[in-house]
Amino acid sequence: MAAAVSTAPRAPLPAGAVSSSCCSSSSSSASMSRRWDPSPNPSSGSGSRLFLAARRGERLRVRRLAGAAPAPAPRRRVSSVVRCGGGGGGVRSPDDADAGSGERRRGWDALFHDAFQGAVRRWSEYVGSHWPLAPAGKDAGLGKRVESRREEQVRGEVEEEEGKWSWERWKQHFALIEESERLVDELQLQLRTAVYREDFRSAHKLKLAIAATSKNDTVGRAISDLNSAIEEERYMDATYIRDHAGAGLLGWWSGISGNLSDPYGLIIRISAEHGRYVAKSYDTRQLNSDGPGFPIFEIYFAEANGGYNLQAVHLKPDDSDSQQLSNTLREKLGMDSINISSSSFGAKHEDHNEGVNMDDQNSDDSDISAGPAGFKNLPSDSTPVPRVKILKVVPMENVNQDYIIKIFDQMSDEDDENDNPEDEIESSEDIGDGDNVEEAEAASAEDNVDESGDESDIEALISIDFITEDDKDFMSPSSTKAFERMPARLERRDRFSFSFYTEQYSKRQDVEKVQGISKEKVGLRTAQQDDDDLQFDRVKLVGSNRKLSVLQLGIKQHNNKVQQKLYGVTHFSRIQIPVSSDPLTGLYMTASGFDSEILSLQRKFGQWREDDSSEEHRDLQFYEYVEAVKLTGDNLVPAGQVVFRAKVGKHYQLPHKGIIPRELGVVARYKGERRIADPGFQNPRWVDGELLILDGKFIRDGPVIAFFYWTSNFHLFEFFRRLKLPD
């Protein structure tokens, strides 16, 4: 086996040494050929042996360029044919062999480079033929979407690094909490069943499963840790949980809207549920009967990075529910339209051009005593439908303000007497009964219809009560799925107050509602303020030849049918529930059946603030007084304002024996002031009045305090009774 190895270039030899070098090279070539020849033949010539060695060296070089690994050689040897000549004969040196091998090596490199470039070109053509490029516009849109997704992903990663969660992350947390709550409820039901059957082994397994499922209940775990910290007197830990885990939000709160056009206020209760805090609003009827509240917002807490993440959620109710009452009347009673007007008590017939119209779809020549189409044979279905009953039909010529108040008091008394429903049915005529409807309408027709039979307008006052079937609230949502969760923000100001900010998702709708509400006034009240009764000012039942003009339609509502909503910012303050039995401290509610408001009485010492702040008081006299602040207001005096005040103490007590009837049970009488104003809290002013403290012995759960005030036009008594909020 022979190999051709190139040597390093050397300096050119002198001319005299060429012959000697040729001879030495030829002798060395002969000796090398003899060394490489495996079977030397002395008879063969040295030229053939040199030629074969050169051929073997070329084949070895080709194999080495192709990638074959040659046998390791300790030394590189020169195998080439050297022609020695004298004079001008050319001599092929090892440098010439090195140049030839370099050229052959560059040729193989170019071959491999061309092959690689061709393969890449064919692959590009193949890919381009099967996946054509998209247009530039689509590429730009796709690029924008990819960039936006990357930005959202980066933003989410940054927020998670900072301890904040994105809204999408919170929505996943909401779904996880709902599923966990459902599983816990099912396991607790099985646990009660196992305990009832005395299967304690299964009960133990179920308790372990409940504990494992409740690992996402951050709120429940925080409440448990708070109770443990208080029992173990670890007050620093308890303070941290109260301030950072939301435990300090539990309890009753009164809310005042930041919108000046909303004077009504809210009473809410925040309670702890699975994985969240839920705030429910209550009206006066629900507070009296311990009824269920209406959820308005939620507060979620989640553990992250050794702390707590908070997310407030506004429960936006379905807007279609607000129109359900009108739709129910229109569908079940066969009416075309129901519109609320803005007239008041005692308005005349000419002032009702924009009143509420309830047009009969099946107008014919029948008498009005037969009742409009749709009142008889109401279709029955599984949907809970309000049942209408007529309480009283009286000609308007016999109606005054006292009678209207009496009617509303009667309606309030009947709502309180829920023990015997048969008496309630006997005292009123069900509108579903055709005979009763005819008798009621005939009673009003006998006094108002002319004998000539000509067409005339019959003015009457109809008091109508709505009762839901099967104790179901047809206006309230059946579950939390009826709400839409919207992001909100909760800002804690201190331990006793916080602000709740809703998402501005319907600014235009809010402005329209506010403008509409400000115009809907019923006497001295507004339609939205009446949670207990919606007052439609004018209803026309258009028959064949007679019209019934109803100036007032009181619709009693049960179980919080008027949904209270949050818009913009609402400021909440904690309701302080007093422990003492002081009659001049605590919560009170008006005792009238149709105008229920909640007040907070507080004893104070100093000087009450006068409306005219520029007036300078020369004598700084301090005294003890009591203020009544409205927690729920109306269109006259909004929530958060002082409605009456009085100086208390022995120096300011007035005599009452022989002046006030003993039946009222007056204990003390003080001089005070009552605030009155025009609608919209315009021109507020103070009038003289008296605060009375009653013993409440003559009336069960009767009033405890009363306020008597007078103006140039009327004298009015207001009675108030204690309001006890459930723990």
From Swiss-Prot:
For region Disordered, the annotated ranges are 1-51, 65-102, 340-381, 413-455
Keyword Plastid set for record = yes
Write the record's keywords in alphabetical order, separated by commas.
Answer: Chloroplast, Plastid, Stress response, Transit peptide
Compartmental location: Plastid, Chloroplast
Predominant location category: plastid
Xref: Pfam families: Cyclin_D1_bind
**Ranges of compositional bias, category Low complexity:** 19-33, 42-51
Stored InterPro entries: EX1/2
Which Gene Ontology cellular component terms are annotated? chloroplast; thylakoid membrane
Q: Where is the transit peptide?
A: 1-83
Q: What is this protein called?
A: Protein EXECUTER 1, chloroplastic
Name its species.
Oryza sativa subsp. japonica (Rice)
